[in-house]
Amino acid sequence: MKSPRNIFRAQGPTSEGFIVVVVLWLLGALSVLASIYSVYVVNSAAAFAVQDEQLRGEALFSAALELTAYKHLTQQTHPTSGQFSFHFGQANIAVKFRPETARIDLNAAPKQLLAGLFRALGARPDDADTYGERIVAWRTVQPNAQDSEASAYRVAGLGYQPRGAKFPHANELALVRDIPSSLTERALKFVTVYSGQPQVNILDAPTEVIAALPGMSPNQISAFLLQRDASPQDAKSLLPAEAQQFATVEGGKAIRVLTRIVFDNGRQQSAEAVIVITEDRERPFAILSWRDDSIGMLADSQQ
């Protein structure tokens, strides 16, 4: 029979081995926890950096709009369009602005101008005239709910009728019947609901809008685009007689502002807003629409 001393001596190495295993297990668990924590810290830092960048971007977008309004209000000859840039908050900011009168207003433009835009975008003349008629019918108040236009929408199985009021947003153009979606998508770059004018500003209008004016041949369009910058005061007289009634050189108070931000770390943000200049010194402008490329959505605010 072994003495107690011998028994403890025999069991000693086993106990020591068990303790070593436990210690190693604890060290392994701690190393895993340390790894998890380090990943958490890195991800949290990245998330906070992105959030900080978004907040800085919002502040810089607001600054761009304020500077645009300031230029419009303080310069003796109000620029109808232009661009400027500045560096602030570890970022380069480039701003371009153009009046909404450079676009065709869906609520105010006559049928001829609307049809002219679709012709300029490649539609056949007869089809373009039909599209122009459909837009005018959509925005026109119909005294009788059973009118032929509403009936046509029901027959087409669209499940809705013409609004019978102004377009609240240019994207509603997609609801007007018979206009191909491909044409609608292209037309959205050249239409607005914020101009309020039946004419277009020929000094700032893009080529497609100039081509929408009645009586403009390809040669006349090219000649006009070459001469309008050299003689802006004579721009209207450069147009054929039938186009002059649809032309203006007024900028209007609604301005579309495109802002692009490039941070020093290489990240970029951009936003497009439509603002209206007011006479209120405390609130010199109001935002009518906003589109941020980070969310790809357009929000409207009637302010």
Task: Describe the residue ranges of each PLM region.
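Compositionally biased linear targeting/interaction segments
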Residues: 2-9, 15-303
